UniProtKB/Swiss-Prot annotation:
Protein's name according to its UniProt entry: Galactose-6-phosphate isomerase subunit LacA 2
NCBIfam families linked to this entry: lacA, PRK08621.1, rpiB_lacA_lacB
Organism: Streptococcus pyogenes serotype M1
Disulfide-linked positions: none
One Gene Ontology term from the biological process aspect of the record: D-allose catabolic process
Main enzyme class: isomerase
EC identifiers of the protein: 5.3.1.26
Length: 142
């Protein structure tokens, strides 16, 4: 599993905090905005592309509020994404919604909270079962 991460200009500082946190946890991290800072649309599309390269990959996109990146990610067929600003939602969106990307706002989530959000997301496992009905419904929408 690789964690694909990207940020626009507003999210770069928080992205670096999250990237360091993930590397400390021995996760493979791919930074799509390491060499070129783009707007949230292009950054999100780059993250989605890499996440879709393997069923095991997860993605994290950071912009100022998390909403713009969320809107972009959910426009892509088959992508389930969630904008999160708390730990519980990050964990539950993996367990119940099988979200493969989360978006965060650098002006919403402080570094400590962001680390906890990331922990919940990457450690969460999809529960399947009764939740698959909703995931199938989401996938039919695109």
């Amino acid at each position: 599993m690789a964690i694909i991460i990207g940020a626009d200009k507003a999210g770069q500082e928080l992205k670096e905090v999250i990237k360091d946190y993930l590397k400390e946890g021995k996760y493979e991290v791919v930074d799509v905005s390491e060499n070129e800072v783009r707007d949230f649309v292009d950054t999100t599309l780059a993250v989605v592309k890499e996440v879709n390269a393997s069923d095991d990959n997860l993605g994290i996109v950071i912009d100022a509020y998390g909403v713009g990146s969320f809107m972009v990610a959910t426009k892509i067929k088959g992508m389930v994404a969630a904008e999160v600003s708390d730990e519980r939602s990050a964990y539950m969106t993996r367990g119940h919604n099988n979200a493969r990307i989360i978006t965060l706002g650098s002006e919403i989530s402080a570094p400590g909270i962001a680390k906890n959000i990331i922990k919940g997301f990457v450690e969460g496992k999809y529960d399947g079962g009764r939740h698959q009905v909703r995931v199938d419904m989401l996938n039919k929408m695109c």
